[in-house]
């Protein structure tokens, strides 16, 4: 496949191809401009892959710029987290990290230019009055009584704002556009507001801060961005983006293009709702493995490659739609099926004793680390006469469809022997505590000599060598596909989104490291937890099951 064939195609790339072919641009320069007021989620990953991916494919540049214009909500913690997420996804920004606050002096100068042109004014309406005067989608707004102040008065008042002469909420700078515009964003939008708050980059130098719509377009222009890519909710804002650049003295005028945001089933993307989940302790934090945050997905065991593949598959369009969670899960399942080494762990253990196995003895059984990749090598796993198997792998009675261990019948232990269930012991409540079996000593990794067929295979862990492990069975956070549509989204949290089990793993799992996934044979894909696991306590998170159990539930 050629490089051109390997590239994804979408309407944005078609625009870029046309711009390069026509000579409108000779290079491509994009940017990813998050506000550092929270953790990035899977929706941001789509934008990261789009902006950085385009820059890579066209040998261009992509800036990482923090839109840090609201010191009240922003924190250096989020700056560091976002940088880490972008790098973990496999991307590198061009040059130094940028901050919108780098341009505060220039932004202030452009605001003064608009005042001098009679295109901006200081308004002393309260925020509530501004909302009231703005009108509605069906009714035009009305002019502020402060709209027709002279240039000189506006310059003096804006300087008074800058030097702390007004209290918060008592004055703001607004663009003078059209209060009757059919687009509410064009009804004299606020350009600057007062906030007496220390900024993580500029300290206490400023007490006036520019709004997003004023900052964003100018920052793009100052950085020479050729294609400013935003999600569809900013479509109307493009009019203001162009108005600002058309009315200031700036040599570059980037163009904004909008694409659909990522909506994913069984979760929420709203920063407000995600924050509520954290602050009300419905989850453990922003990196909870049930969260759609990049840090949560990483802790759960998702790989950067699987997230990039997911973003590639869903594509870039102007059509809003909701992606099935199964699509994301399919990407990580395919990745780990191909790349994760195998190991054995028993999640719901019951003791099995092989009565005719030499008492007190054990042996090593050779197992491949991957059934289809001999280059991944093999490992030695201890076997003994007492093992743990999963409780679901034994029944006293069963029909022909049940291919595991049944009383009086045989099954193969993975890469070991054929065993036959002879009897069980139970506790006072009737629960099986021990299964007693016999084994065929001539069947180590081979069929019985007499030709009898043994169809079932189950996994196991030697009891004498087993590592106690905590297993966190994570599932979808919500029980309905569209929790955001519920009257109370918290009421549809899945009560089974986290089930904690205590089981046993094979000794090789002692070497597990956070971020390195395993396939626990016949169970699913798991990784060591980065928060709770210690040298003395192994905690594994289920990344995803071997198959989509939700599809079955919906049938």
From Swiss-Prot:
ATP binds at residues 35-37, 41-47, 231, 261-262, 269-271. One of its GO terms (molecular function) is ATP binding. Keywords: Aminoacyl-tRNA synthetase, ATP-binding, Cytoplasm, Ligase, Nucleotide-binding, Protein biosynthesis. A motif ('HIGH' region) lies at residues 34-44. GO terms for biological process: glutaminyl-tRNA aminoacylation; glutamyl-tRNA aminoacylation. Its EC number is 6.1.1.18. L-glutamine binds at residues 67, 212. It comes from the Bacteria. A motif ('KMSKS' region) lies at residues 268-272. Residues 317-324 are annotated as: Interaction with tRNA. It is found in: Cytoplasm. GO terms for cellular component: cytosol. It catalyses: tRNA(Gln) + L-glutamine + ATP = L-glutaminyl-tRNA(Gln) + AMP + diphosphate. Belongs to the class-I aminoacyl-tRNA synthetase family. Monomer. This is Glutamine--tRNA ligase. It comes from Salmonella newport (strain SL254).
């Amino acid at each position: 496949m050629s490089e051109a064939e390997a590239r994804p195609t979408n309407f944005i790339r078609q625009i870029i191809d046309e711009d390069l072919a026509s000579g409108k641009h000779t290079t491509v320069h994009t940017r990813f401009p998050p506000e550092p007021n929270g953790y990035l989620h899977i929706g941001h990953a789509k934008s990261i892959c789009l902006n950085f991916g385009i820059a890579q494919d066209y040998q261009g540049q992509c800036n990482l710029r923090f839109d840090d214009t609201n010191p009240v909500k922003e924190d250096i913690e989020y700056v560091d987290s976002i940088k880490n997420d972008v790098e973990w996804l496999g991307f590198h920004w061009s040059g130094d990290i940028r901050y919108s606050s780098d341009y505060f002096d220039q932004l202030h100068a452009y605001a003064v230019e608009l005042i001098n042109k009679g295109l901006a004014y200081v308004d002393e309406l309260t925020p509530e009055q501004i909302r009231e005067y703005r009108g509605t989608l069906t009714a035009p707004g009305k002019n502020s009584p402060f709209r027709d102040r002279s240039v000189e008065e506006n310059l003096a008042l804006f300087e008074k704002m800058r030097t702390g002469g007004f209290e918060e909420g008592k004055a703001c700078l607004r663009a003078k556009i059209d209060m009757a515009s059919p687009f509410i964003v064009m009804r004299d939008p606020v350009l600057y507001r007062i906030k007496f708050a220390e900024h993580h980059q500029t300290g206490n130098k400023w007490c006036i801060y520019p709004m997003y719509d004023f900052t964003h377009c100018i920052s793009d222009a100052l950085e020479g961005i050729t294609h400013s890519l935003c999600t569809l909710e900013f479509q109307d804002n493009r009019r203001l983006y162009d108005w600002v650049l058309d009315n200031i003295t700036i040599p570059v005028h980037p163009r904004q293009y909008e694409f659909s945001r990522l909506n994913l089933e069984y979760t929420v993307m709203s920063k407000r709702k995600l924050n509520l989940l954290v602050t009300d302790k419905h989850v453990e934090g922003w990196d909870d493995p049930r969260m759609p945050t990049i840090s949560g997905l990483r802790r759960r065991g998702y790989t950067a490659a699987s997230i990039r593949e997911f973003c590639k598959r869903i594509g870039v369009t102007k059509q809003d739609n909701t992606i099935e969670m199964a699509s994301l899960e399919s990407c990580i399942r395919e990745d780990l099926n191909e790349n994760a080494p195998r190991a054995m762990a028993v999640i719901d253990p019951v003791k099995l004793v092989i009565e005719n196995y030499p008492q007190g003895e054990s042996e090593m059984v050779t197992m491949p680390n991957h059934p289809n990749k001999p280059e991944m090598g093999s490992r030695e796993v201890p076997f003994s006469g007492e093992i743990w198997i999963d409780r679901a792998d034994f029944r006293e009675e069963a029909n022909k469809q049940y291919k595991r261990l049944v009383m009086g019948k045989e099954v193969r232990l993975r890469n070991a022997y054929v065993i036959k269930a002879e009897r069980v012991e139970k506790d006072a409540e009737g629960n099986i505590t021990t299964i007693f079996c016999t084994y065929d000593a001539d069947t180590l990794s081979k069929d019985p000599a007499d030709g009898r067929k043994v169809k079932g295979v189950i996994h196991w862990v030697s009891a004498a060598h087993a590592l106690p492990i905590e297993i966190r069975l994570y599932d979808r956070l919500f029980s309905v596909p569209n929790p955001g549509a519920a009257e109370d989204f918290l009421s549809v949290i899945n009560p089974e989104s986290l089930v904690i089990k205590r089981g046993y793993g094979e000794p090789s799992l002692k070497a597990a490291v956070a971020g390195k996934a395993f396939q626990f044979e016949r169970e699913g894909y798991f990784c060591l937890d980065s928060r709770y696991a210690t040298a003395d306590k192994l905690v594994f998170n289920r990344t995803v099951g071997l198959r989509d159990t939700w599809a079955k539930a919906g049938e």
